[in-house]
Amino acid sequence: MIKLVLIRHGQSLWNLENRFTGWTDVDLSKNGLSEAREAGTILKKNGYTFDVAYTSVLKRAIRTLWIVLHEMDLTWVPIHNSWKLNERHYGALQGLNKDETAKKYGDEQVHIWRRSIDVRPPALTEDDPRYEANNPRYKTLKKDEFPLTECLEDTEKRVVDYWHSEIVPSLKSGEKVIISSHGNTIRSLVKYLDNLSSDGVVSLNIPTSIPLVYELDEKLRPIRHYYLSMDGEVPEGEIPKHISF
């Protein structure tokens, strides 16, 4: 049996402010730092170890991973960064307060932008200061490949591509893998692994910085999955609450 650990970054400053974040490089909040330390302690207490780690090029996921590995005394573990593990790009919504956006466009429209599979939010324009195609972290991306907005389907496509090209070979070679990423990125991977329908993924929420364990067979098909707490495996359907850490 193969185990894969997925973890969404700890609470970010814009999570705290209830703003659309997307590809904006926002750091962790004080609470998010605590959540990351807690996650590392949970994994260590439950006897987990890792040979390789994967994350995005956004600091909230990177820092979460650093803290988790530090708490586990695994700072030597190789880390691979890729924009393909970035959060979904929220286009022109990035930086906007979610409640204020709902007042402007209506709750239903914002819900469609956030939760539908194939509807993209309004796109950025290339003259928008939030457009970052020239940022060095995206030097491997051609200008016409850089997204101006994304739907969940777009996100799933790049995540699954990275899964097959980079992560699957690691798992098949026997390496113990952790992925530190983002809410919609993990939703996309879970949708793919569990073969969820579009309706099934709409209500799927990934909590911040709670280790999610997938047990996979030799063909990397899911056997089962569960969240971890200080006391071990959490019963199916339950999500553990954070403790003060």
From Swiss-Prot:
InterPro entries: His_Pase_superF_clade-1, His_PPase_superfam, PG/BPGM_mutase_AS, Phosphogly_mut1
Molecular-function GO term, any one: phosphoglycerate mutase activity
Listed SMART domains: PGAM
Single GO biological process annotation from the record: gluconeogenesis
Keyword Isomerase: yes
Record has Isomerase as a keyword: yes
Pathway: Carbohydrate degradation; glycolysis; pyruvate from D-glyceraldehyde 3-phosphate: step 3/5
Database matches in PANTHER family: PHOSPHOGLYCERATE MUTASE
Alphabetized NCBIfam families for the sequence: pgm_1, PRK14115.1
Name of this chain's protein: 2,3-bisphosphoglycerate-dependent phosphoglycerate mutase
